[in-house]
Swiss-Prot record:
The organism of origin for this protein: Bacillus pumilus (strain SAFR-032)
Swiss-Prot/TrEMBL keywords: Isomerase, tRNA processing
Record flagged with keyword DNA repair: no
Gene3D superfamilies, per database record: Pseudouridine synthase I, catalytic domain, C-terminal subdomain, Pseudouridine synthase I, catalytic domain, N-terminal subdomain
Residue numbers annotated as active site: D53 (nucleophile)
Residues that, per the record, bind substrate: Y111
GO biological process: tRNA pseudouridine synthesis
EC number: 5.4.99.12
Lineage: Bacteria, Bacillati, Bacillota, Bacilli, Bacillales
Assembly behavior: Homodimer.
SUPFAM superfamilies attached to this UniProt entry: Pseudouridine synthase
InterPro entries xrefs: PsdUridine_synth_cat_dom_sf, PsdUridine_synth_TruA, PsdUridine_synth_TruA_a/b_dom, PsdUridine_synth_TruA_C, TruA/RsuA/RluB/E/F_N
Protein name as catalogued: tRNA pseudouridine synthase A
Keyword Acyltransferase listed: no
The protein's role, per its UniProt record: Formation of pseudouridine at positions 38, 39 and 40 in the anticodon stem and loop of transfer RNAs.
Amino acid sequence: MKVKCTVSYDGTHFKGYQVQPGQRTVQTEIESALAKMHKQDELVPIVASGRTDSGVHAKGQVIHFDTPLSIPMERWPFALNSLLPDDIRVLKAEEVDESFHARFSVVSKEYRYKVSTETHQNVFTRQYACHFPYRLDADKMREAAGYLIGTHDFTSFCAANTEVQDKVREIYTLEWKNVSDGLEMRVRGNGFLYNMVRIIAGTLLEVGSGKFHPDEIKAMLAARNREAAGKTAPSHGLYLWEVFYDN
């Protein structure tokens, strides 16, 4: 039986999602919990929609795994959560067809990036939003965001050391919302390159602060050079919000 789970986690104290020897990761914790449920020494392998970096959070990460256990679907979250640390929670479990793949069946993803513009950093949210206490022109940020919507080569907006050859992606929506303590960027697309969302966020923050003009985004895209775009925003403001599949 193949099980699909929606998982939420606070990335603060993890060295990212993916297994790393000697490090605390989300994947390791979930696979360890599954091993206990299956009463075996070996980890039960899971597959995720994608990896997240150290410090990045997830509201709706999706994983799948195969199991011989005949536990009712509604009991899986309770069973797993009883074995998981408090900074990981399984929100939902459902049986899926054998053809489903948490990574390769993805149609689109939504990420959110939270920015606190308060004068003094809020000690209670310092790990969950990027603190940017400078004057921001949100209208210019929204104008610049418009140039990124659509299908583009995002070479300038991904880590220079990425091994991915095809850097063409499509962004469906990209908007900045006013929230109680600042701004929130919401972006949905068919796929994202390594550090792409954080580089977009960092660049648009620099547009808002006046370092770049909104229409300079067009030249950044055309340059296809990481050095043409702005800074990479800190990881702790980023959330994998939702993963979308057909049906």
